[in-house]
């Protein structure tokens, strides 16, 4: 019975602690019309200390969303446009000789910010991609002989254009796996697009975004997210979903066996659990339910399942495979 009381107390505490989520949503809603999935994805990444890979055609408010979030959180923001001639030093920084001090001084690169938008990450060679991915993983960079910690919170939002693949350097599977979430951004609805047009044509300009949260609040909120209760049944459900990507036959999904080249790694299980907790938190709840897991499952697994040539020949997507798994794995 004490556990039930604790859950009740925890739920009330999380309801109190997560008030800022609604304030943040309202602030983002001033500028971003629709795109609720994009906003949720940003909040989940921010609260679970994970990075996000976004796929969508140009002009869908990817840059606007992260700049608005940076303003609302009163955080530093930098945008890096990835191009074929970009060097790792352009990203992380370098040593520059100062005639004044007759010594080398450090000039830090744009990666030293709370929010980093890596625009069209697949336009730069592997050495630049790996420099960013190392910074994402280690939360620190080495310039010369010294190592520098990156600011907290640190969130990388990398974008890819799904249409133009000429002259690109696709991210290797091992690198893509470091992104906690991969979200696909879709076009707005008719009514939303009308609102966007009106907002941009009005003489008043874009509404001003107020600072409603501090980076320190986000770091504190992450600690609270870790306290969100996850029952053993939910843990088992998460493990079953990931195992179904590796051994579909064990879950009566024999038809998927020839379509999956490789399934999710243990990192996928960790990411799914963390994302489900963060999703429960932004829904102002102190415990995880199966719907939370299902809500984030596509974004967590989309880039972690490899398709065989047979699947590609039949135009089968990872989305269809994930949906099939969710429809067949027993929900607790």
Where are these regions (language model features)?
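Conserved C-terminal "switch" segment of AAA+ ATPases
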Residues: 13-18, 31, 168-169, 182-255, ...
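C-terminal engagement/docking regions of AAA+ P-loop ATPases
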Residues: 1-9, 14-15, 248-332
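Pre-Walker A (pre-P-loop) alpha-helix and adjacent loop at the N terminus of AAA/AAA+ ATPase modules
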Residues: 14-60, 243
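Conserved AAA+/SF3 P-loop NTPase catalytic/coupling segment centered on the Walker-B
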Residues: 89, 110-137, 151, 166-175, ...
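P-loop (Walker A) phosphate-binding loop of NTP-binding proteins
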Residues: 57, 91, 159
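AAA+/SF3 P-loop NTPase mechanochemical coupling elements
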Residues: 105-114, 143-160, 171-180
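Walker A/P-loop
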Residues: 46-83
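Short glycine-rich substrate-engagement loop in P-loop NTPases that contacts/grips substrate
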Residues: 86-115
